């Protein structure tokens, strides 16, 4: 895997003061992903970690179709106040790895009655196309071998097992009428622990 690491910069946020680095990943077929790591000044032996895949509609625009924006905010708040410190790894894998353009097309199919997994399949994609290999490199860079992982996704736990000893912590946010069916599909078809 080829990647490069930016310089470290301060990142004051509404949740607290953090530091940040970007990992530029050179993927297959000349793809380029610029991931962001937001972390506390001190990282203890077992930091609190959230692996968060980009969701422009939820994270930036506050879409109620998913739980992403709420999970991002809750994770940042918990990391900021965790005694062992922590980090949020923001992976540029929009739409569970299918990209923004295809995600919007999947949304259009959802408007016609397909669920989130069926919509991806109609577009020729699996239900989840994400890769977590870069996370292993990020953990190496920060000398992380044990983590408390904020996730409801068992696939993330399995994917990170080669890189660190993982203890899962749920991240539960309130549902709303727009995302209840979506959350049920994540539970039933993607195995999320909700």
From Swiss-Prot:
One of its GO terms (cellular component) is cytosol. Its cofactor is Zn(2+). Pathway: Cofactor biosynthesis; riboflavin biosynthesis; 5-amino-6-(D-ribitylamino)uracil from GTP: step 1/4. SUPFAM superfamilies: RibA-like. One of its GO terms (molecular function) is GTP cyclohydrolase II activity. Zn(2+) binds at residues 55, 66, 68. Keywords: GTP-binding, Hydrolase, Metal-binding, Nucleotide-binding, Riboflavin biosynthesis, Zinc. It catalyses: GTP + 4 H2O = 2,5-diamino-6-hydroxy-4-(5-phosphoribosylamino)-pyrimidine + formate + 2 phosphate + 3 H(+). GTP binds at residues 50-54, 94-96, 116, 151, 156. Binds 1 zinc ion per subunit. Gene3D superfamilies: GTP cyclohydrolase II. GO terms for biological process: riboflavin biosynthetic process. InterPro entries: GTP_cyclohydro_II, RibA, RibA-like_sf. Its EC number is 3.5.4.25. The active site is at 128 (proton acceptor), 130 (nucleophile). It is an enzyme of class 3 (hydrolase). Belongs to the GTP cyclohydrolase II family. Catalyzes the conversion of GTP to 2,5-diamino-6-ribosylamino-4(3H)-pyrimidinone 5'-phosphate (DARP), formate and pyrophosphate. PANTHER family: 3,4-DIHYDROXY-2-BUTANONE 4-PHOSPHATE SYNTHASE, GTP CYCLOHYDROLASE II-RELATED. NCBIfam families: PRK00393.1 (NF001591), ribA (TIGR00505). HAMAP family: RibA. This is GTP cyclohydrolase-2. It comes from Helicobacter hepaticus (strain ATCC 51449 / 3B1).
């Amino acid at each position: 895997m080829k990647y490069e690491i930016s310089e470290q910069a301060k990142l004051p946020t509404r949740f607290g003061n953090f530091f940040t680095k970007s990992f530029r990943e050179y993927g297959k077929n000349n793809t380029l992903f610029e991931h962001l790591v937001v972390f506390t000044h001190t990282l203890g032996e077992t930091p609190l970690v959230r692996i968060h895949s980009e969701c422009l509609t939820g994270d930036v625009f506050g879409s109620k179709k998913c739980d992403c924006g709420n999970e991002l905010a809750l994770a940042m708040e918990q990391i900021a106040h965790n005694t062992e410190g922590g980090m949020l790894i923001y992976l540029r894998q929009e739409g569970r790895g299918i990209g923004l353009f295809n995600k919007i097309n999947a949304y259009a199919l959802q408007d016609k009655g397909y669920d989130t997994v069926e919509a991806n399949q109609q577009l020729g994609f699996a239900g989840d196309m994400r890769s977590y290999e870069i996370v292993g490199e990020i953990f190496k860079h920060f000398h992380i071998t044990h983590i408390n992982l904020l996730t409801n996704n068992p696939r993330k736990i399995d994917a990170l097992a080669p890189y660190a000893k993982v203890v899962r912590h749920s991240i539960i946010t309130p549902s709303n009428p727009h995302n209840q069916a979506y959350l049920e599909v994540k539970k039933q078809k993607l195995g999320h622990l909700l």
